[in-house]
């Protein structure tokens, strides 16, 4: 009886531990999580140096978020194998971009991970369009025409320990084309269209239609050819096919 009670207590303790850990993982439908992801992306997109003339305001896409969640749940510290296949990842986009962050759940916030990607700006030379170190996360983050995003978090103890989390963001249309700048250098918003408004140095279209609600949208892209890697995050790089 004592042994049975002991196992019952251990089972309850284990259940509590799982529940405690799971409660820290935000849902892809959590408005607070969504706002944090969008705000951090747009804050850094609006602060690029040199300034961007055509940087678009980024908005949330449910389909990209579902894609990010499905891949995060795989707990693989590598890129989704659908990224180099036309319309394979998500029907709304021919190709999708991807950034991945890995770290402890206690230190995780969307802003923390996204800022880590942005900090790669120090390794990017805008004039030569080259990186002195890994900077693919930065260039995807500030790719002017990648203005749909969906992100997700999952616990992945197999990747480092019980508190290890993986954070995945997917972008549409995909960015990171070789020998192309992520945006047009110039006065902020100077290349916004007539339909767009300048919001915090970003070109924002009022009442923008989200791709997964628009079955007629046919965005285009190029086949991805290269993957960037560092110990803490991954950035998906694309090479333009000539």
From Swiss-Prot:
Q: Where is the SCP domain?
A: 39-171
Tell me which positions the record assigns to the signal sequence: 1-22
Q: Cross-referenced InterPro entries, in alphabetical order?
A: Allrgn_V5/Tpx1_CS, CAP_dom, CAP_sf, CRISP-related, SCP_GLIPR-1-like, V5_allergen-like
Question: SMART domains given for it?
Answer: SCP
Q: Where is the lipid attached (GPI-anchor amidated glycine)?
A: 221
Glycosylation-annotated residues: 119
Q: Which family does it belong to?
A: Belongs to the CRISP family.
UniProt name for this protein:
GLIPR1-like protein 1
Species of the source:
Homo sapiens (Human)
Corresponding gene? GLIPR1L1
């Amino acid at each position: 009886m004592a042994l049975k009670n002991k196992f019952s207590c251990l089972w309850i303790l284990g259940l509590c531990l799982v529940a405690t850990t799971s409660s820290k993982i935000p849902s892809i439908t959590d408005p607070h999580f969504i706002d944090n992801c969008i705000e951090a992306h747009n804050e850094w997109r609006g602060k690029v140096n040199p300034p961007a003339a055509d940087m678009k305001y980024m908005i949330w896409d449910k389909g990209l978020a579902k894609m990010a969640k499905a891949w995060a749940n795989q707990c693989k510290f590598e890129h989704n194998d659908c990224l180099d296949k036309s319309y394979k990842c998500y029907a709304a986009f021919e190709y999708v971009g991807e950034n991945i962050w890995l770290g402890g759940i206690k230190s995780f916030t969307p802003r923390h991970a996204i800022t880590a990607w942005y900090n790669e700006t120090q390794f990017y030379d805008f004039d030569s369009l080259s990186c002195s170190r890994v900077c693919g996360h930065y260039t995807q983050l500030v790719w002017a025409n990648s203005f749909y995003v969906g992100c997700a978090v999952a616990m992945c103890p197999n990747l480092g320990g019980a508190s290890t989390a993986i954070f995945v963001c997917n972008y549409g249309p995909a960015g990171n084309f070789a020998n192309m700048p992520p945006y047009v250098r110039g006065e902020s918003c100077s290349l916004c269209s007539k339909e767009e408004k300048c919001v915090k140095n970003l070109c924002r279209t009022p009442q923008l239609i989200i791709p997964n609600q628009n079955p007629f949208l046919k965005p285009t892209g190029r086949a991805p050819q290269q993957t960037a890697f560092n110990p803490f995050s991954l950035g998906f790089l694309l090479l333009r096919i000539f």
